[in-house]
Regions:
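Short loop/turn motifs at secondary-structure junctions and domain boundaries
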Residues: 55-60, 145
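Conserved GNAT-fold acetyl-CoA-binding loop/helix
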Residues: 30-52, 65
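Acyl-donor (CoA/ACP) binding surface of acyl/acetyltransferases
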Residues: 1-33, 66-175
Length: 175
């Protein structure tokens, strides 16, 4: 399983002892505003457990990496991707409120893209972002993703339908 290193970060596979951090992200209204409604702990635990099995480049489950400060080992967020086709994968990321706006998302997403394109056998990365989530949109654009479209009223969240913004990044376009 990959471990990605950047000057400030260590991104390593989710482990059993990451449960409390995973739960704290999933229960934080600010973090989950554009992601999901409140869920029972049992549902969050099922999502956590689904990300624990050993991952390899052709796995059908999410590669889930805990983004940590490289010196203090403090967990800051999660990043990863999931294959949808042979050489296409969807990226995702969540960061704790205190870790937002400090460049950790960009640094870890660049490391993830580097890995996906150089080692993971990925030709195309995609992302789906709930419309209105400007921070995620800006992060994806800064990383080189292109907004390719918008799905109207495609995601049910907080009691109403929301549009989804669709992003893509091709290996040959990635710098």
């Amino acid at each position: 399983m990959p471990e990605l290193l950047t000057p400030r970060l260590r991104c390593s596979p989710l482990q059993l002892d990451d449960w409390s951090f995973f739960l704290s992200l999933q229960q934080d209204p600010q973090v989950m505003l554009y992601v999901a409604d409140n869920r029972p702990i049992a549902d969050i635990r099922a999502a956590f457990d689904a990300r624990l099995p050993l991952w390899s480049p052709k796995s059908s489950h999410w590669l889930c990496l805990v983004v940590r400060d490289r010196q203090s080992h403090t967990p800051l967020g999660l990043t990863g991707y999931c294959h949808h086709d042979d050489d296409i994968a969807e990226v995702g990321f969540l960061f704790a409120p205190q870790a937002q706006g400090l460049g950790y998302g960009y640094e870890s997403l660049c490391a993830l893209c580097d890995y996906a394109f150089s080692t993971g056998g990925i030709r195309r990365l995609t992302a789906s972002v709930t419309a209105g989530n400007q921070a995620s949109k800006q992060l994806l654009l800064k990383t080189g993703f292109i907004q390719e479209g918008e799905l109207r009223e495609s995601y049910w969240l907080h009691g109403r339908w929301h549009n989804d913004w669709l992003f893509g990044l091709m290996r040959h376009d990635y710098q």
